[in-house]
């Protein structure tokens, strides 16, 4: 298992990828129809009318459509639509046959878009909670600098004691190795040790 900082970096990279995929999906599959303006903001209507509207899902697009730059990098709804059930398969095949290959993807229906939007939001929240957890288990997150320095000194002392024990064991191992070498030398010369059990 990787250390906490590596896990944290991986989660941050995944969160950035999820942000990109979410924005790509939202910009690609939203129909860009104007929202209902809030009653307290009367100037919102002219701003909303400036947003270009994607063609509706039922209307086939003409051959003059251009590629959408974010469409290739964004999530496509094919796997989710195919997994939705066999009843949607003929309808999806018919829609894909009507649409030219170079046309941008059609916007999702409002219900599908809302469902996927919630799923993407849930995934972002889960990833953010993973990041918060990893940050909370980092050492020293709840201690002062002086406490951290004291802990470092304690760990250094423990390390010194363990290193001394390791050195003593190494010296003992070396001594026992020399003793075994001496016994093997005596056996090879045939003096001092008999082979009878």
Curated annotation (Swiss-Prot):
SUPFAM superfamilies found in the cross-reference section: Mediator hinge subcomplex-like
Region feature Disordered, mapped onto this chain: 37-112
Segments forming a coiled coil: 140-183
Any one Gene Ontology molecular-function term assigned to this protein's record: transcription coregulator activity
Localization per record: Nucleus
Transmembrane region(s): none
Biological processes per GO annotation: regulation of transcription by RNA polymerase II
Cellular component aspect of the GO annotation: mediator complex
Biased composition (Low complexity): 60-70, 90-100
InterPro entries: Med7/Med21-like, Mediator_Med21
Gene3D superfamilies: Mediator complex, subunit Med21 (6.10.280.10)
Record keywords: Activator, Coiled coil, Nucleus, Transcription, Transcription regulation
Region forming the signal peptide: none
Subunit architecture: Component of the Mediator complex.
This protein's name: Mediator of RNA polymerase II transcription subunit 21
Organism: Coccidioides immitis (strain RS)
